[in-house]
Swiss-Prot record:
Region annotated Coil 1A, chain positions: 83-118
Protein species of origin: Bos taurus (Bovine)
Chain spans, region Disordered: 398-421, 450-469
Chain intervals for the UniProt region annotation (Linker 12): 233-255
Region annotated Coil 2, chain positions: 256-394
Subunit structure: Heterotetramer of two type I and two type II keratins.
Compositional bias (Basic and acidic residues): 405-421
Protein name according to UniProt: Keratin, type I cytoskeletal 26
One BP annotation, GO: epithelial cell differentiation
Amino acid sequence: MSFRLSSGSRRLCSPAGSGQLTGGRTGFRAGNACGGLGAGSSFSGPLGSVSSRGSFSHGGGGLGSGVCTGFLENEHGLLPGNEKVTLQNLNDRLASYLDHVCTLEEANADLEQKIKGWYEKYGPGSGRQLAYDCSKYFSVTEDLKRQIISVTTCNASIALQNENARLTADDFRLKYENELALNQSVEADINGLHRVMEELTLCTSDLEIQCEALSEELTCLKKNHQEEMKVMQGAAGGNVNVEINAAPGVDLTVLLNNMRAEYEDLAEQNREDAEAWFNEKSTSLHQQISDDAGAATAARNELMELKRNLQTLEIELQSLMAMKHSYECSLAETESNYCHQLQQIQEQIGATEDQLQQIRMETEGQKLEHERLLDVKIFLEKEIEMYCKLIDGEGRKSKSTYCKSEGRGPKNSENQVKDSKEEAVVKTVVGELDQLGSVLSLRVHSVEEKSSKISNITMEQRLPSKVPQ
């Protein structure tokens, strides 16, 4: 089973295959730094890299500019230090999760190997099949497995949709917070520009006041000059002629014109200096504002990309944890099923062992019964042999008696011959059996008939009853 991780998608693909994490070009991308999850199950990024062996190495992928570094390192920037710790914790958790997945895969492979060995030993293809046939339940179990897998997949998809909705809401919240921070920074810049404008207005008002003072002074000088001219004209209108050899008088018009030109040059110089100072300050301030705005935009874009990658990784981690939980549930269910099957097999083995023990005991009982019957047979054969010997002995005795009585006379010899001819021996063996077929007792009846005289000889031998099994 393969899991494909991509930075542009929050979906989880799980086609059938090997249990190895593969992915395209995903990771924390900042500037020219990028990373991915490849065939070696490793994760790399500008903040560090994680491999499937659980090691964490700090990578050196740059963030593009010194301004971004300032935002990351400054505690008052847009990316505080706790998010670095969060990313490092996520990398560590991903590494430990990959180790746990490898351990579970090894345990699953071990269980599958044991199950395969058990099927090779007791399966349909082997000669040692179990007495109980479970093949009729295979279709039901397969149907239940398919239903469980479909329900588990549906639950995982619903959980993934819920997580996507929550992450979308978090995206909008973060976007709102970023826009609010940007608005506040712009308002702060506007307030700073307002203060600069107020300073420039105060400077302009001071210059206007100085210009008004100079204009008033010029007006006063003009007024004094006119009064002096009137006085001089009134004095020149009399009859007194006074000739004085004096130095030539000062030309007030030229003096005033020179003073006016000097003050105008001074005012123009002050105005040019103020305008140059204002332009210089405005240019540097505008340049600083544009630089700060560009740096803030770049840092904001970088931060948004990092947050987007973080959210993607969190979604993938949640999906992997859900899949891991489903695999653990399936493994526990499989273990419980096989434990139940093993318990049933052990019960069948115990029942078979009990049956074998009972058969063994019955065999022992039948063996004892056979030995007992064999003893009875031997005893009966001995009795028969003894009776045969007795009969043979009585026959010889009767013959000897016949030979002795032969010379006594014809009458006695005729009677003896008649008696010997009429002599007969009848033996009857009567046995008692119980319900199991065991011999309880034997009776042997011997009947001798000699010329209408019957003698009954009864032998009885009691045998012990069969020992109950």
